[in-house]
């Protein structure tokens, strides 16, 4: 970190006249250094450095960064194979589960835009979000497919992809 980035709140001077709260930060740095690349770029860096570390634990099952990275790349290839291109909007309507994380990063790898929709949203809400976002594809869990089936004729989706929790 540069000297300026290491400045502590206790050293606040006239350089930060519009941030009077910084004097209350104590020894906590108020300038942080952030990764300059993409979200996936940072994950790739972590995969390279710590391939065997646990990326996530879901219902007692641990998944390494190596496997997580392979899953994301496989999903990204599948999205490209069905015609998803950079800039396309993809609705992800899934709960907090590993499939959601994999799909989210795969969408980023492709260069598409993730439109996150809560899976407990009503059919009308999902239809609204699909229209508003201009999504060309939706990804959801099999248990929520009935919501998409009910509105599919009202929206322009080239694909509805189903995942399941095993």
Q: Where in the sequence are the language-model features?
A:
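Flexible, non-catalytic linker and terminal segments flanking ANL/adenylate-forming cores
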Residues: 1-36
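Structural core segment of the AMP-binding/adenylate-forming
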Residues: 2-9, 109-166
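AMP-dependent adenylate-forming
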Residues: 16-19, 41-64
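Short, flexible loop segments at the rims of nucleotide/cofactor-binding pockets, characterized by
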Residues: 31-34, 67, 114-117
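Conserved AMP-binding/adenylate-forming core of the ANL superfamily
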Residues: 35, 52-97, 101-105, 122-127
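Short polybasic/polar patches that bind polyanions
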Residues: 48, 80, 108, 131
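A structural signal for short coil/turn segments at secondary-structure junctions
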Residues: 50-51, 83, 133, 155
């Amino acid at each position: 970190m540069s000297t300026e980035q290491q400045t502590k709140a206790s050293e606040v001077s006239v350089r930060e006249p519009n941030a009077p709260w910084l004097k209350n930060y104590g020894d906590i740095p108020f300038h942080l250094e952030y990764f300059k690349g993409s979200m996936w770029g940072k994950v790739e860096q972590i995969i390279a450095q710590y391939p065997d570390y646990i990326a996530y634990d879901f219902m007692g099952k641990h998944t390494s960064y190596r496997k997580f990275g392979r899953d994301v790349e496989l999903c990204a290839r599948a999205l490209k194979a069905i015609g998803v291109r950079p800039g396309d909007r993809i609705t992800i309507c899934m709960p907090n589960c590993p499939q959601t994380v994999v799909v989210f990063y795969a969408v980023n790898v492709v260069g598409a835009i993730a439109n996150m929709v809560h899976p407990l949203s009503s059919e009308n809400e999902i239809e609204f979000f699909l229209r508003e976002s201009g999504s060309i594809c939706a990804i959801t869990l099999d248990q929520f497919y009935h919501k998409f089936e009910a509105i599919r004729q009202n929206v322009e989706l080239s694909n509805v992809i189903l995942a399941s929790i095993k």
